[in-house]
Amino acid sequence: WGNKTRLVWTTFTPQQVDIDTDSDQGWGYLMSILDQLGASHVSSIRLDAVGYGAKEARTSCFMIPKTFRLIERIKEEGAKRGLETLIEVHSYYKKQIDIASKVDRVYDFALPPLLLHSIFSGSVDALEHWINVRPNNAVTVLDTHDGIGVIDIGSDQLDRSLKGLVPDPDVDRLVETIHANTQGESREATGAAASNLDLYQVNSTYYSALGCNDQHYLATRAVQFFLPGIPQVYYVGAMAGANDMELLKRTNVGRDINRHYYTAQEVEENLKRPVVQALNALCAFRNTLPAFDGTFSYQRDGEVLTLAW
């Protein structure tokens, strides 16, 4: 533009140009958005992929100290306008804990793969450790519009000496078990097999990752709902949806395996399924029982965890 060829930074795709938050124009643009949201009585903002928001030469430009300062700055400006700040970032688990102390809420992205690990391995060691250290100011999820983030439980991608919640060989076994449970469907949608922006996510619906086992699916949802935080259920998860291979083949976008377009008739049919009815009952239980405003505790007996309020 301006009759000149200029370089722009696009972390993800050419359709998403990064904002220079160091410039007056870039920062002013962000503040104008916060002004408009505050004036519209919005209660919270979600900073998507904010881990890539700060740039500094000779660094990874991901979750560097400058990123934390940017997050704190946006959080402070949001608070002035009555906005809570929710952070979306897939990263090494200790960085998630650090971020949580600086903002209003974070996503608990470690929980989905940890629950799969517990189901597949029969061990609750890693899950129990996470329960003891995880931030309580979390939005809990099992599934989102993206894949299952195994990066959130593994060792630090930039420093392998920093161990994860689950040893890397066990993370590899977790991924292979998901591929086996989906009869290879998730393998077709993950990594270099399809057009993926993130090679550290396994693309599959959560229900399919569990081999479409109703009991396992409801058990993982129950744990999600019983842990401190605000539970969020993705629309495909609300339908206990299986992988959409037709959409994947049509678009060759890995994440589309978990982005089925439901017709009204399909929704009506799915609402009659016992697993979906049980999930809806569980949602109502979580939303209406006053006990969840109390104090959380848990007990362990062998490989059994009992969560209580």
Model-derived features with residue positions:
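Active-site and adjacent substrate-binding regions of carbohydrate-active enzymes
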Residues: 1-309
